[in-house]
Amino acid sequence: MKQYIVALMLACSIQGHSQDVKQATFVSPFDFTLTLSGNFGEIRANHFHGGLDFKTQGVIGKPVRALADGYISRIRVTNGSGHVLDVVYNNGYTTINRHLSGFMPDIARRVEKLQYEKEDWEVEIVPEPGEYP
């Protein structure tokens, strides 16, 4: 009984420690109603889908907005995901934007230059924080 009381007192005295809940406000990445074309966790041929895919009303090249203030932390072109931008937000969250039809002109020029230098379609650039806000 003594052990039970000691254990109960110990359990009651331990404070729960967890991460603080982040409060964040995001905007839509598009200026039109969001419609999903691919869901997170959806079964694919050899894996589960790891993101959300949005329909763009059948139009290629629609502008994609950042969800909040932040900066581009990685720029990639890959065979599987095409044009990719990783964004770090000031609130601590990140997004990976895949399957983009292209990049803004200054980023596109930098990517194309690197592709010619490497003689390779697949490239990766890690800009300095704040270089592309």
Can you say where each PLM-predicted feature lies in the sequence?
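Sec-dependent N-terminal signal peptides
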Residues: 4-13
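Surface-exposed, glycine-biased beta-strand/turn segments
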Residues: 18-133
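Positively charged n-region of N-terminal signal peptides that target proteins for export
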Residues: 1-4, 19
